């Protein structure tokens, strides 16, 4: 048997080690749930009635503007930061019409006390970083601190809807394709309030 030269052997071992670590990292990623509803709560925080009210609120916005908005609540994003997870969810769900690219995603990692708003490129002029930050700071964070998650999300949808309605009208189109890459998005940390998981 012919032995490999030491430098080649060391390089091969390093590549195997990197491949194993890369595979382990992907194995640890939180799965993206199927888009079975415009509101998906994997934390059992929202009541059935609260989820229904949010779904109806979002459905009305979509009927009026065509824009597609969804909310995802998870306990934690585990080893992945919420920015990366939010992008994976947005890319998988492909929110937004093909002609308009008008998708918005709200992600809440409850136990991590983090939230994020992903905005498709076509809505960046209406939902700027500053406007999204105000929605997070003024609507979501105060309500979340008081354990009023439904109220915070409803208020956020109202404000996002107001911004979306400022976008130029686009003819209705329901075909779902991969949207243009979104900007980094907005994220924030909220402080634990009563009843909020540590």
What are these regions (language model features)?
Residues 190-198:
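Single-pass alpha-helical transmembrane signal-anchor segments
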Residues 11-24:
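Bacterial N-terminal signal peptides
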Residues 6-7, 22, 34:
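General helical secondary-structure elements
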Residues 26-191:
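Folded, non-transmembrane soluble domains that reside on the lumenal/extracytoplasmic side of membranes
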Residues 10-11, 183, 194:
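Basic polycationic patches enriched in arginine
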Residues 5-7, 18, 147:
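Hydrophobic alpha-helical context, especially transmembrane and signal-peptide helices
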Residues 1-13:
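Bacterial N-terminal signal peptides that target proteins for export
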């Amino acid at each position: 048997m012919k032995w490999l030269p030491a430098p080649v052997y060391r390089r091969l071992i390093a590549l195997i080690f990197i491949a194993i670590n890369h595979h382990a990292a992907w194995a640890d990623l939180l799965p993206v749930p199927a888009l079975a509803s415009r509101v998906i709560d994997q934390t059992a925080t929202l009541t059935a009635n609260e989820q229904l009210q949010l779904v109806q609120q979002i459905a009305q916005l979509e009927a009026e503007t065509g824009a597609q908005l969804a909310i995802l609540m998870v306990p934690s994003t585990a080893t992945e930061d919420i920015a990366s997870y939010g992008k994976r969810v947005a890319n998988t769900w492909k929110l937004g019409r093909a002609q308009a690219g008008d998708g918005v995603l709200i992600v809440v990692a409850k136990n991590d006390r983090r939230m994020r708003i992903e905005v498709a490129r076509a809505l960046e002029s209406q939902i700027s970083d500053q406007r999204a930050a105000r929605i997070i700071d003024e609507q979501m964070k105060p309500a979340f601190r008081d354990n009023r998650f439904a109220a915070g999300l409803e208020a956020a949808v109202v404000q996002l809807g107001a911004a979306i309605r400022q976008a130029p009208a686009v003819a209705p189109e329901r075909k779902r394709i991969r949207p243009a890459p979104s900007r980094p998005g907005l994220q924030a940390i909220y402080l634990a309030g009563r009843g909020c998981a540590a």
